[in-house]
Amino acid sequence: MLASSRSFTRKRPWRVCRWIHSPATPRLNSVNQHDLAHFAKILAPSSILSTLPPTSLPPAELDQYNNDWMGKYHGSSNTVLKPRTTQEVSEIVKWCWDKRIGVVPQGGNTSLVGGSVPLNDEVIISLTNMSKVRSFDPISGYFYCCCPCTCCKFK
């Protein structure tokens, strides 16, 4: 027998409470100095931003990565990595997988739902250094570009 149409129109409880007191996942590890030393073998020194030693930046330096552009969601990551190639991204993700470190990929950080903002102390992989327009077809109007390209690149 079919359920009444009333049951389908009833409001469902909203269970999304991602930003309300999200405890750290006990199965994930935090970034430490050993991890930063490994990332330094993969990336240029200017591509590693961290509040941990040896770089020890002030936390305010990471605010643009820990907060969405609307100021609605706020994260608490202490490390931002800015790879330039897909090979570097691959090596970072492999290391984080092996060491059970959480990762948050971040393109242009233009998300309206907070998907690019870390919940806890995950590593942010900022893809801004990969922002390139590879080609443009003037006949069709199509751009072929890398992932973090935003509309302002096309002007």
Spell out what each predicted region is.
Residues 1-155:
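Noncatalytic alpha-helical scaffold of FAD-dependent oxidoreductases
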